[in-house]
Swiss-Prot record:
One of its GO terms (cellular component) is extracellular region. One of its GO terms (molecular function) is antigen binding. PANTHER family: IMMUNOGLOBULIN HEAVY CHAIN. This mu chain was isolated from a myeloma protein. It comes from Canis lupus familiaris. It comes from the Eukaryota. SUPFAM superfamilies: Immunoglobulin (SSF48726). InterPro entries: Ig-like_dom (IPR007110), Ig-like_dom_sf (IPR036179), Ig-like_fold (IPR013783), Ig_sub (IPR003599), Ig_V-set (IPR013106), IgHV (IPR050199). Residues 1-116 form the Ig-like domain. This is Ig heavy chain V region MOO. GO terms for biological process: immunoglobulin mediated immune response. Keywords: Adaptive immunity, Immunity, Immunoglobulin.
Amino acid sequence: EVKLVESGGDLVKPGGSLRLSCVASGFTFSSNGMSWVRQDPGEGLQWVADISSSGQTYYADAVKGRFSISRDNAKNTLYLQMEDLRVEDTAVYYCATEGDIEIPRYFGQGTIVTVSS
């Protein structure tokens, strides 16, 4: 059974920072690309960042230069370092597998990030 468990969400003031974590199990983490996506209140899912199995990273324009995705294959853990947070970064953040023939796209339960003064 594929399981993704996010943590690290919190209430933070604008300009603050957070690090989200996602512990994966039930599949070969090191062989799969991973993503962070987010959902604003009342909105659809928005892609945030991807990291390939080899460690290449890709970012949405809205977070480029402020967020950093990384992975620790020894710990089966995905990270999202978030700096200079803005009110518009408020959302539920989900980690997700890269979906392909071998493993469909799975999501975690999400962790809530609220940016407010």
